[in-house]
Amino acid sequence: MPLYRQEKDWKQYGAEISRTTLANWIIYCAQHYFQPVYDYFHRELLKRSFLMGDETRVQVLNEPERRPQSQSFMWLFRSGEDGLPVIILYGYSPTRSGDNAVKFLDGFSGYLETDGYQGYNKVPGIKRCSCWAHIRRYFIDAIPKGKQFDYSQPAVQGVQYCDRLFRIEDSINKQPVSYTHLRAHETDSYL
């Protein structure tokens, strides 16, 4: 609930608590209680052998020394499906520089699945992997106008290939058997 509404609600109960005070409480809790938890999960995330990463634009109003129309970025890093509990962490940055990924992933060594953003190439010690959903979109964009049903087109074949992989993944996810075993069995023959 927004702080201005909380301020109003508290006032109705006879407690005059300013938005500034409420915001300071949130900041204090985040710094003293949530930051250590975040740091713990960050260290655990970096121990994994496969991560996924993405960054998306966000607009932050009233950010010091920046125009309200400025674009900032929220970075997301997630553990892969490795049978361990999933870890998902977000990180804010005023820029999209690949240096942000370098800083966040410092100490990580393994596979990193991302979109085509070249900034991830700055991260040392990783092996870049592409996301099949993004690859499928690139194939769709490569299909010439009016040729989406022309199965001799390489881009149409690429879309079909991705769709087949997605169907395999979907059937795997519905199976009660060991995920790792089934995935290796089904996808190795196809890939």
Which residues does each PLM region occupy?
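RNase H-like DDE/DDD metal-dependent nuclease/strand-transfer catalytic core used by mobile genetic elements
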Residues: 104-135
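Short helix/loop capping segments that flank catalytic or ligand/cofactor-binding pockets
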Residues: 60-62, 85-87, 120-123, 139-142
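Key DNA-contact positions within bacterial/archaeal DNA-binding proteins
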Residues: 20
